[in-house]
């Protein structure tokens, strides 16, 4: 599960300003 968390964290940081709505969905 650590891998998923890390990947999600990085992905969220990258698209936290652009695709935040898509990331949450």
From Swiss-Prot:
This is SPbeta prophage-derived uncharacterized protein YotF. It comes from Bacillus subtilis (strain 168).
């Amino acid at each position: 599960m650590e891998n998923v968390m890390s990947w999600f964290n990085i992905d969220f940081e990258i698209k936290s300003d652009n695709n935040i709505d898509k990331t949450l969905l």
